[in-house]
Design a protein with these regions (language model features):
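A short alpha-helical cap/connector motif
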Residues: 1-131, 138-159, 163-213
Length: 213
């Protein structure tokens, strides 16, 4: 989903930090070999994730939804030298693909991969997270929020992708559309929670930045 005319979109990208070569390589291989390559964060959003992480300088990062590892490599750019990034995905077939790029990045020892149901895995990680990125199955967004809130502290930031869902959030809800229904619920939850402050950014398919007060 694009909010700017194509020429303006190109201008924005041209005047933002260049995409690192490793991420260019990862993106190219994803498009060549992996199903649903549009799930990639992509150049501009990836640089946004990187910038936010660098501004926060987190010790512990949680990512829900790894895919091929692009966004994890963006988020880890701002991590502390003794920090960890825990990333969770259900697709075990992409594990080796992810690990190959994680090891190439120089952050391999700081990125910990988990395969399985995030709702089961998250409670087993004994960490307080400074930064969380949610980009997984939409129907569980409200559940992810509930389970991660106790693992955050004042100043922690939650980034959430696809919160505009190609515009479906402002259209009439279709019967049986559980993903859009869950996103509507999630967007309301984070906006109405008095312990959170939220801004919804019109980047790609909608990116929410939420800070714990």
């Amino acid at each position: 989903m694009h909010f700017l005319p194509e020429k303006l979109d190109d201008y924005v990208i041209a005047h933002s930090q260049k995409e690192p070569k490793l991420l260019q390589e990862l993106s190219r291989e994803t498009w060549q070999k992996v199903l649903a390559p549009r799930m990639l964060s992509g150049h501009f959003q990836g640089r946004v994730l990187s910038m936010i992480s660098k501004l926060i300088n987190p010790k512990n990062v949680l990512e829900i939804g790894t895919y091929t590892g692009y966004s994890a490599l963006c988020l880890v750019e701002g991590i502390q030298t003794n920090g960890e990034l825990h990333t969770i995905d259900t697709n075990e077939e992409l594990y080796d693909f992810q690990r190959r790029y994680f090891n190439k990045s120089g952050y391999g020892n700081q990125i910990i991969q988990h395969i399985g149901n995030a709702l089961d895995i998250i409670p087993t990680i004994d960490k307080t997270f400074d930064l969380v990125f949610i980009d997984a199955d939409k129907k569980n967004y409200p559940n992810y929020l509930k389970i991660i809130l106790p693992m955050l502290k004042s100043g922690s930031v939650i980034l959430t992708d696809n919160v505009l869902w190609t515009g479906k959030v402002i259209e009439e809800l279709q019967k049986g559309d559980k993903d859009t229904e869950a996103l509507l619920k999630y967007n309301k939850m984070i906006n109405e929670n008095s312990q959170l402050e939220t801004v919804l950014l019109p980047i790609r398919d909608g990116l929410t930045m939420t800070r714990v007060k």
